[in-house]
Design a protein with these regions (language model features):
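C-terminal accessory/tail domains of diverse enzymes
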Residues: 1-247
Length: 247
């Protein structure tokens, strides 16, 4: 594409990746970055502030895109990953992990679909159950130390995921396929029906948080306007300075 078209800038550079924040991976380390600083410099100097789980899609069955159960399970997954040893991997291992990810995405619903792990070949189902089983101790701890009123939500939600791994018809993909088949419609029609349903749910949701959301939005707009007024530097000069900050 180039950087300019008809004298106007259309890209920051002529590379596929414009800045380091566009380096996409399944899970990406991030840090809140002060204005004008390079994200990679701040990340290296101050460490990881949070992680983005990039490979998680919106839940089409929820009008806000995610359920409480999913939030709890993702917490468990992150904690499980944190407490397990994670040595640096080679390029070859990275390629193998990419193959696993691709196989799960493309063949995850196929009975007997196989992947190659450090322990050898195994089915996607068995590997999923192995990982989920490894989360049980963490779920027990969270139930005992974090949950209120003696609730066992962590273990209960984990148990639900184990049930799903054993019967993929209960997975989101299984529910989606069943809905499409039962309604005898195509995927596009299904998406439109869901969008209308979700709009209806959103329109009838309690407005108790509307005021606070509006206040936050206005604060953000005011802050953006203030930054634009204070920053009078020419964009090309700013870009040259910004791109030259890699340490």
């Amino acid at each position: 594409m180039g950087e300019f078209k008809d004298g106007e800038r259309i890209q920051l550079n002529d590379s596929i990746i414009q800045i380091e924040n566009e380096y996409y991976s399944t899970i990406r380390p991030k840090r809140v970055c002060p204005t004008g600083d390079r994200p990679i410099n701040v990340l290296e100097a101050e460490g990881i502030d949070y992680v983005e789980l990039r490979c998680i899609d919106l839940n089409p069955s929820s009008f806000i895109g995610i359920t409480e159960e999913q939030v709890y399970f993702l917490d468990l997954l992150i904690l499980y990953s944190f407490f397990n040893d994670s040595p640096e991997i080679t390029d070859s291992e990275s390629n193998e992990l990419f193959k696993i990810h691709k196989t799960v995405v493309n063949e995850g619903r196929m009975p007997g679909a196989m992947i190659k792990t450090n322990a050898g070949k195994t089915s996607i189902k068995d590997e999923a159950l192995r990982i989920l089983s490894g989360m049980k101790e963490i779920a027990e701890f969270m139930d005992n130390e974090v949950s209120e009123n003696g609730d066992r939500v962590w273990s209960d939600y984990l148990s639900n995921q184990i049930t799903v791994a054993e019967n993929l018809d209960l997975a989101l993909s299984g529910n989606l396929l069943k809905d499409i088949q039962d309604q005898d419609i195509n995927f596009q029609e299904y998406g439109l029906r869901l969008s209308h349903l979700h709009k209806h749910q959103m329109d009838n949701t309690s407005p108790k948080n509307d005021h606070s959301f509006s206040a936050i939005a206005n604060e953000s707009l005011d802050a953006a306007e203030k930054i634009e007024k204070e920053n009078q530097i020419d964009f090309e000069d700013y870009l040259k300075e910004f791109l030259g900050k890699i340490s």
